Amino acid sequence: MHLANEPHVNNMIDGKYEYFSFISYRWEDEKMAKWLQEKLEHYKLPTSLCEQNPDLPTHIRPIFRDKTDLNGHTLEESLMSALESSRYLIVTCSPRATQSEWVNRGIQKFIDLGREKDIIPFIIDGEANADDPKNECFPPALRSLKGERAIYGININDNGRDAAAVKVV
């Protein structure tokens, strides 16, 4: 997200976005999605950063996750509305996520809105653009982004999950 470099973060504060981000995940990865939501919502931006950028929020919230934020509409209506109302889309990527129609639809929705640069792949298992399809963690819509549109993920296996969560910020 790199808040200090985001000129449009003020739009979210001014009411353009209801959610700071939307976490998309496969139900088997729910434990990690819940952990990430809690970690991000409780993360306090450094005081020095907030002092230099007074329009920044001190915390990164709210973050939409279906188990905590769904309302009474149909599942599809609720999810699509929440996606449109979210500044960022965090995709919990794993080989399991590649099998989820809902995860892929959410990614495609952000792409269709012209917001692929606001998608943050959070790799918890597998490998992006893997040679072995069984190890692939990017859903088809993410894999479709090539060249200048390609997105690289944040991998918890590189520095551990806590450091990876901070990289999301």
Per-region residue spans from a language model:
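An anion/phosphate-binding loop that grips the pyrophosphate of nucleotide cofactors and donors
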Residues: 86
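C-terminal interaction surface of TIR/SEFIR-family domains
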Residues: 1-39, 68-77, 81-82, 98-101, ...
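Short mixed-charge
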Residues: 42-62, 129
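Flexible domain-boundary/linker segments
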Residues: 50-53, 96, 106, 127
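Glycine-rich, N-terminal phosphate-binding loop of Rossmann-like dinucleotide-binding domains
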Residues: 93
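Hydrophobic acceptor-binding patch used for acceptor engagement in glycosyltransferases
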Residues: 89-90
